[in-house]
């Protein structure tokens, strides 16, 4: 499916004076040399999904027989990152209530030889035992501070790494769209389901309230699109007068 979509996209580029940038996310299980070669040729960026240290990843991502996936996927990811010259990829982790010490996971990625990484908070039903609660926020903020100190320390030692959420250009800032809204959901970003349904973002898939349309009909629910357009820094009282509103 991926190969067919890329081929189809490439066939449209010249006639429409466009250049597609494709990105692939993989959990690594089916990753092999052929897929790596294809991605290195066609994918502008790849996301290597690894939930954290061995014990964290294997707790959240076991195989059906209960065994962990860490030992299978990490060597593949290391090989893949090297094949891309340690550029144009991210090792993406997820922190939950099980690993609020997620700085250790990012540091672990660096110790494995990865140079491009990201760590995102889990989105989960509040009833799940791993769901993040409001009471966890102070600990999470402290953890970002701890990670920042280690980040600076390693940069000074000549063994630095890139952490996606610390990459802020204070001189130029991000593009105008990101400065205004931060998120492109429903305006410059769409999620397409295997059935062709269009949603503002993958987080909304399955929530019929946010169904925008279909690949056959195009966007028909323009009210939702307009609602997302109005979500910007000037519409948020806590943001509109903040000095960091265009960098946050």
Name every feature range the model reports, one short phrase each.
Residues 2-122:
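Radical SAM/AdoMet-radical enzyme domain recognition
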Residues 180, 205-247:
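Membrane-interface junctions of multi-pass transporters
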Residues 49, 90, 118, 182, ...:
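Structured core elements
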Residues 128-208, 247:
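A C-terminal junction/extension of Radical SAM enzymes
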Residues 56-60, 127-128, 211:
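Short, charged, surface-exposed secondary-structure boundary motifs
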Residues 52, 123, 244, 248:
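Flexible, active-site-proximal loop/turn residues at the rims of small-molecule/cofactor binding pockets
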Residues 50, 121, 167, 202, ...:
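Residues at the C-termini of beta-strands that transition into short coil/loop
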């Amino acid at each position: 499916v991926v190969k067919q979509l890329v081929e189809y996209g490439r066939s449209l580029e010249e006639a429409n004076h466009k250049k597609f940038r494709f990105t692939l996310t993989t959990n690594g299980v089916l990753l092999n040399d052929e897929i790596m070669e294809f991605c290195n040729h066609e994918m502008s960026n790849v996301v290597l999904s690894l939930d954290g240290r061995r014990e964290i990843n294997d707790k959240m991502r076991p195989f059906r027989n209960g065994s962990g996936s860490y030992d299978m996927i990490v060597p593949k990811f290391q090989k893949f990152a090297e094949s891309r010259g340690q550029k144009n990829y991210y090792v993406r982790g997820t922190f939950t209530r099980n690993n609020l010490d997620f700085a250790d996971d990012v540091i672990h990625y660096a110790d494995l030889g990865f140079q491009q990484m990201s760590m995102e908070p889990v989105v989960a039903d509040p009833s799940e035992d791993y769901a993040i609660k409001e009471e966890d926020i102070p600990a999470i903020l402290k953890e970002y501070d701890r990670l920042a100190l280690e980040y600076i320390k390693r940069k000074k030692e000549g063994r630095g790494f890139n952490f996606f959420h610390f990459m802020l250009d204070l001189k130029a800032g991000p593009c105008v769209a990101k400065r205004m809204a931060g998120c492109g959901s429903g305006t410059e970003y769409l999620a397409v389901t295997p059935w062709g349904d269009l949603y503002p973002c993958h987080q909304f898939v399955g929530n019929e309230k946010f169904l925008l349309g279909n690949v056959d009909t195009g966007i028909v629910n323009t009210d939702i699109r307009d609602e997302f357009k109005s979500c910007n820094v000037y519409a948020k009282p806590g943001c509109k007068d903040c000095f960091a509103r265009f960098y946050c």
